Amino acid sequence: MSNPFLKQVFNKDKTFRPKRKFEPGTQRFELHKRAQASLNAGLDLRLAVQLPPGEDLNDWVAVHVVDFFNRINLIYGTISDGCTEQSCPVMSGGPKYEYRWQDEQRFRKPTALSAPRYMDLLMDWIEVQINNEDIFPTNVGTPFPKTFLQAVRKILSRLFRVFVHVYIHHFDRIAQMGSEAHVNTCYKHFYYFVTEFNLIDPKELEPLKEMTSRMCH
């Protein structure tokens, strides 16, 4: 295992959240396999994100949200030792963008936090969302709530902020590990998906607009 990024990923001393998995034999498991097969076959990412004919949009979106959470959580985990209260006292994306945390429990008003604190709260919050059967039902035949896409938009908008922080403040670490290609591919996959289905407000995409125009067009 010569790739330093992979060494970080499989370092047993690192603690990553367990993956949300799909039960074999379910429709979502089959969709997940199909999506992974498209990526492994080197299919154009723009085509890979498109809804397969005859499939349900909510199922397709649910599969990808869980996958993006797992991947982005992993990417942040590999650079987290360099993202500290001292190095990143404010969760930001350069001097122009500051992200404040708000939830329905402890932080009812937007609150400025350090990047590592923000990330911990974010990953915990998303994990709760995707394991909530009322939002991401796993039983065959259980319908998605009418608010599903609204909930997904909030999750994906917040996940995008992880990319913003990592690219702007920790890209040197990504480069040092030789993992630019991996992270860039993950970003392009994410970008094509959220724009294909209009799942993020274009204003949220502004911090990486220049990089995206070079990478994805």
Curated annotation (Swiss-Prot):
Zn(2+) binds at residues 83, 88, 165, 170. This is MOB kinase activator 3A. The keyword 4Fe-4S does not apply. Disulfide bonds: none annotated. Pfam families: Mob1_phocein. The keyword rRNA-binding does not apply. Keywords: Metal-binding, Zinc. Belongs to the MOB1/phocein family. InterPro entries: MOB_kinase_act_fam, MOB_kinase_act_sf. PANTHER family: MPS ONE BINDER KINASE ACTIVATOR-LIKE MOB (PTHR22599). GO terms for molecular function: metal ion binding. May regulate the activity of kinases. It comes from Mus musculus.
